Amino acid sequence: MSAFFRHKSFFIINLQWNQEYLNMNIAIVGTGYVGLVTGTCFAETGAKVTCIDTDANKIEGLKKGIIPIYEPGLEEMVVRNVKAGRLHFTTSLEGVLDDVSIVFSAVGTPPNEDGSADLKYVLEVARTIGANMNQYLLVVTKSTVPVGTANKVKEVICHELEHRGLSIDFDVASNPEFLKEGNAISDFMTPDRVVVGVESERAKKLMSKLYRPFLLNNFRVIFMDIPSAEMTKYAANSMLATRISFMNDIANLCELVGADVNMVRSGIGSDTRIGRKFLYPGCGYGGSCFPKDVKALIKTAQENGYEMRVLKMVEAVNNDQKDILFQKLECYYHKDLVGRTIAVWGLAFKPETDDMREAPALVLIHSLLRAGCKVRVYDPAAMDEARRRVGDSIYYARDMYDALLDADALFMVTEWKEFRLPAWGVMKKTMKQAVIFDGRNIYDGKELAEQGIVYHCIGK
């Protein structure tokens, strides 16, 4: 049972008497991953939430319970809160500003070519607010943004109010998200911490009121200044990315000196100063956060006359690591790859999502195609996304075993649960050559050797 469902009754029981909280009206601008999860979870705790997006087709779909992203448990929660009248969807931000006290900006901040965050959508939301607000509002940035963005949002709103000849009080705040794709609902409802950056007592009181159910349940809500809150998200993701790249560097060295990275990981993870999380070597990280946020923090440092030397190497190690399985394949077949059939299990950057942004599988597939290989792929959730990104140059298998037909090797790239205990006998009969390159170290090499399967992994 997830942590969220263990605590679900808390929110329902305690909010029955908390009419003040039940009367809270908030708006969430952007119905992407962050916006939709945030809005739906706030509605689940009892607040009245309106989610806004400029994509009319997406909004109409959401009204019907059609979810544009893959996230376990989200569809059921959206449908439940729409039926309860707590969750609404619209294309008009202007139409809801008179009815809400807090507006969350959860729009995209895609990277520019130089690695900096593109703030055009964030600032467009600010312009719309300034051009249409008629009462006090707390404008909260939920998107991952560089330090100083809140000041830019404030300037844009002030400019629009001056253009209208109005003087209306408002506050800005930063409330970065720390959601993991595939576990977002539990992350939101039972958080390690909630970080809130404010610059006025009024804003702090309003955010405290919004997060009251979490405070009552003893979850940590940490208030700080806005620049520190903005920096916290980038620093957190960059630290996690650093741990991954460090362990990949250690794993590669282990192979050269005859050490076993799994034993090394156990040894250092037992040190309470280090801990066991994010110490797993593999074929590189991807997704919508780590690559983008590392680049953005490097760029922020450059803009302020400083060089993030560690993060530059974190990025370099990760880029190299995404090609590590292909290099092992080249070595095994002495670069004789033309015409060989290679199976790929796992396309999303991690399990329990269909997100393929910066996914290691994309790098591997393109390397295989350039080498003249035939590629057969399977992923429980990301097949449609793969078709959109890769097209018809690869074969999209019906299931995990169909991907293995006549394969000269298997790349295990994303550690979905269904890949962890395959039928080894079926694999051997289906593959032309029973060779596995395990990019997540999920298999037991001794067991595979007993099965007559050639096994290569990371770091030993």
What kind of region is each of these model predictions?
Residues Y21-K460:
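Structural/interface elements that position substrates and couple domains in central-metabolism enzymes
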